[in-house]
C-alpha cells in the first residue's frame, strides 16, 4: 500500500484497513497524499488526487494530467480520470471519494452523469477547504455531492429516467467495413487495434450527440490500451476518447512517457456531427510525434 496502484482490489483494501484499525471508507483519505505523486502536471505543478470506493468494494485512483504545448481543455481532471478508471474496470457505481482539493465546477458537472450522483459522498482532505455551513457531514466527515452542486443540470433534464448512464452497460451496435478505412495497408497489429477501438466505441457514452467513438493505443512493447468518448449533459466537461485511452496508459503503462506510444486507432461515425479526428490527431502528434494514427469509420448495424 506504500505505492498504491490505480485499482486496489476489495480484499487488499479490507486488509489494509484492518491493519490500520479503520474502515475501508476511513482508509480513503490516507491514500490521497501518496496518490498525488502520480499526477502529471508540467504546466500547473498542482497535483490533484482522488481516491474512490466503488460498489464492488474496490478502490480506484484518479489524478490530473496536463499536456504542454496544447490548449488547456485537453487536460484530464482528477475526477475525470477516476470516472474513466471506473468505466475501464467495469465498476457500476461510485459510493465515496476523497480528494485533495475541492472539485472544480467542471468535475462537479461531469460527475452528474453517474446515477444518483447527489448521493455520492465526498471528503476534501485539504484543511483549507471548508464545507458549506449548511451541509451536514457524516460521522466520517463525508458530505453529499449534492451539497456541492445543489441546483444541478444533468441527464435527468435531457434523458428518460431509464436511460443507461455513464457507469452502466452500453452497446452502440457499431460495425466497421474494411472499405471505410482511410488508411493504406492493414497489418495484423493494426487489425487488432481496429477491433479494440471498435469495442471501445461500442461502450462509448454519447446520449446527447449520438456520436460514439473509441480509441486504442499501442506502446513500443506491444501493449494495447483503450478508451471511449463520454459525454456530459453540459457538453464541455465531456471526456474525449484519446484522453480516456491515455488514462489507461497512465494507469497501466508503467509510468512511461507518451513517446512510447507508437500507434493509435480512432473509430467514429463518418457522418458524426461531433467528430474526434482532428482534435485526436492534434493531441497525439503533440505528445508522441512518431505515433502512427489511423481512423476507421463505423456504422450502426
Swiss-Prot record:
SUPFAM superfamilies noted in UniProt: Cytidine deaminase-like
One annotated Gene Ontology cellular component of this protein: cytosol
Domain of life: Eukaryota
Signal peptide (from-to): none
Pfam families, alphabetized: dCMP_cyt_deam_1, dCMP_cyt_deam_2
Tissues/organs with expression: Expressed in roots, rosette leaves, stems and flowers.
Reactions catalysed according to its record: cytidine + H2O + H(+) = uridine + NH4(+); 2'-deoxycytidine + H2O + H(+) = 2'-deoxyuridine + NH4(+)
Activity control summary: Inhibited by uridine, CMP and dCMP.
Family: Belongs to the cytidine and deoxycytidylate deaminase family.
Record's protein name: Cytidine deaminase 1
Protein species of origin: Arabidopsis thaliana
Gene name tied to this protein: CDA1
